[in-house]
Amino acid sequence: MAAHHRQNTAGRRKVQVSYVIRDEVEKYNRNGVNALQLDPALNRLFTAGRDSIIRIWSVNQHKQDPYIASMEHHTDWVNDIVLCCNGKTLISASSDTTVKVWNAHKGFCMSTLRTHKDYVKALAYAKDKELVASAGLDRQIFLWDVNTLTALTASNNTVTTSSLSGNKDSIYSLAMNQLGTIIVSGSTEKVLRVWDPRTCAKLMKLKGHTDNVKALLLNRDGTQCLSGSSDGTIRLWSLGQQRCIATYRVHDEGVWALQVNDAFTHVYSGGRDRKIYCTDLRNPDIRVLICEEKAPVLKMELDRSADPPPAIWVATTKSTVNKWTLKGIHNFRASGDYDNDCTNPITPLCTQPDQVIKGGASIIQCHILNDKRHILTKDTNNNVAYWDVLKACKVEDLGKVDFEDEIKKRFKMVYVPNWFSVDLKTGMLTITLDESDCFAAWVSAKDAGFSSPDGSDPKLNLGGLLLQALLEYWPRTHVNPMDEEENEVNHVNGEQENRVQKGNGYFQVPPHTPVIFGEAGGRTLFRLLCRDSGGETESMLLNETVPQWVIDITVDKNMPKFNKIPFYLQPHASSGAKTLKKDRLSASDMLQVRKVMEHVYEKIINLDNESQTTSSSNNEKPGEQEKEEDIAVLAEEKIELLCQDQVLDPNMDLRTVKHFIWKSGGDLTLHYRQKST
């Protein structure tokens, strides 16, 4: 019954399989950092970003290596995080459409909330009420009681949520006051919408911005709101008066990040122009340029360990996170080093960050080579690398070499059908397998660099082999004789067969490889590490998630059928031979040209010779005593095969001929002729 239910479930949705080629421990942010949270009690900084990983860092400057741990469960960009319960719990929002609840001290995911139907872009937190709100591109806002979320278990896994409706466009920013009495959302609608989270009642809509509202802040009692927009302005709103009471034109481009001191007197702003300003809200003409980053600013986090704040952490579209000192900033008025005309360039307060959390490189360019197995990539440091998709690993770092030259250098006149797709969104290689083309690529074991125990050269399906390797640890895929009768049979056949057979028998992928089952629209159904599929819980979830097209290969061992290619075989015009009846032939698309040459020699040329000569005295037909190898040698000596008047390499296969030489619609046509002696 369970299996029947699983197949029905799989039938209702198209499930893809993805995996990430990466190191076991990814110590450094590999892409832009979208969110920051500081835990001053433990001197820890949490970063969350576009590589899908949340990392914990020590902000103790005496520590040589600040990295503490990674929190991994998301499969797409992490867009926002909030620390709750005095730093014990972390809530995260992601483009994988989930909100996750983490034990922040121990670094593990406690539960996953799947209420959103699209990217979750923003979170808001009411500290006094332990209330969190989440919002995103599905235009929905959901309210979560943190104490309820942290009490969820495998058996007690139902949670009730309130929702705030009324947004007409995708939500990009969210704010809630500490008391949990006001919530504000910002969206591409260019307005601020305001609710009372206690009653879910809509209170007002505030107009004034002319572009997306990317950042929002509320004061403690919820009477004032600050907003930053892609229109380049910061606005201060009075919720009591339901209007904008001040507009700050500080930046040259969009404002994407805001922070404010506890007294709500100074706003810190950053955005597309890479500059970070501090502006006195009471005197809009007075502002100081704190620093200039090397990339657009995505998020900032004030160090609130003292008042005024001694420093600010800044995250950008690059992977490095910087801490900038704010010491002396509130004396800028006296020194006169401030900007009251944003058209005049001013000197930044800081030219170097006080502390740096170094980031790693992000892959920004890739090229799939002709063998449809290897990939060349280029990263943000201009380093080129060579990867093996089949074995899910990096083969070689090539350094700062010319990317296009490396592609040309590795070009082979070979055609293998596409059987996977590549995504670079996280800055790492994510490979996706889809039922529609996963099994399109067959190669010979020899061409793939694999040897068979019996010395044969079997045909291997790349997608099938990879799926078997990804699920190698899942007990359901193991060939394991369970009952006594089977054991007796295998005992007769020898000890070898009595062993559990795992994987594909040719190669393994790194056990730490993340494997993701997701709907073909982006929603993740299940993520696990390759090595964990033997666990009881993981195995049960795989039973519910793995689609039938993967079961067929990994569990039932039903390999797909070979791809056939139709073609016509005719004598070349120069041979003077009579054109044959145009029979449409069909063969495996991996069939080598030499095999067609053998067919021509044995079935056409030899038969012609036989009809023109008398039978020998012992009535033996020509070629009967020739071995297969001799026929192959003779065929290559005597026969030429051509396509589009180009003589073909005997090692080329039919699909390569069709792709590189035929290059036309309709069925492939090959011509043969005898070599001139």
UniProtKB/Swiss-Prot annotation:
It holds the Pfam family DUF3337. Residues 607-628 are annotated as: Disordered. Knockdown of WDR48 increases Akt activation. Its main location: nucleus. Changing residue 272 to A: In UAF1(11A); impaired DNA-binding. In UAF1(11A); does not affect ability to promote USP1-mediated deubiquitination of FANCD2 and stimulate RAD51-mediated homologous recombination, because of DNA-binding mediated by RAD51AP1. Residues 609-620 have a biased composition (Low complexity). GO terms for molecular function: deubiquitinase activator activity; DNA binding; double-stranded DNA binding; single-stranded DNA binding; ubiquitin binding. SUPFAM superfamilies: WD40 repeat-like (SSF50978). Changing residue 77 to A: Impaired binding to USP12. InterPro entries: G-protein_beta_WD-40_rep, WD40/YVTN_repeat-like_dom_sf, WD40_repeat_CS, WD40_repeat_dom_sf, WD40_rpt, WDR48, WDR48/Bun107. It comes from the Eukaryota. This is WD repeat-containing protein 48. Gene3D superfamilies: YVTN repeat-like/Quinoprotein amine dehydrogenase. Regulator of deubiquitinating complexes, which acts as a strong activator of USP1, USP12 and USP46. Enhances the USP1-mediated deubiquitination of FANCD2; USP1 being almost inactive by itself. Activates deubiquitination by increasing the catalytic turnover without increasing the affinity of deubiquitinating enzymes for the substrate. Also activates deubiquitinating activity of complexes containing USP12. In complex with USP12, acts as a potential tumor suppressor by positively regulating PHLPP1 stability. Changing residue 363 to A: In UAF1(11A); impaired DNA-binding. In UAF1(11A); does not affect ability to promote USP1-mediated deubiquitination of FANCD2 and stimulate RAD51-mediated homologous recombination, because of DNA-binding mediated by RAD51AP1. The modification Phosphothreonine is found at residue 613. N-terminal WD region interacts with TIP and C-terminal region mediates lysosomal localization. The WD repeats are required for the interaction with deubiquitinating enzymes USP1, USP12 and USP46. The keyword Metal-binding does not apply. It is found in: Nucleus; Cytoplasm; Lysosome; Late endosome. Belongs to the WD repeat WDR48 family. The keyword Acetylation applies. GO terms for biological process: DNA damage response; double-strand break repair via homologous recombination; embryonic organ development; homeostasis of number of cells; multicellular organism growth; positive regulation of double-strand break repair via homologous recombination; positive regulation of epithelial cell proliferation; positive regulation of receptor signaling pathway via JAK-STAT. Interacts with USP46. Interacts with USP1. Interacts with USP12. Component of the USP12-WDR20-WDR48 deubiquitinating complex. Component of the USP12-DMWD-WDR48 deubiquitinating complex. Interacts with PHLPP1. Interacts with RAD51AP1; the interaction is direct and promotes formation of a trimeric complex with RAD51 via RAD51AP1. Interacts with ATAD5; the interaction regulates USP1-mediated PCNA deubiquitination. Interacts with RAD51; the interaction is enhanced under replication stress. (Microbial infection) Interacts with papillomavirus HPV11 E1 protein.
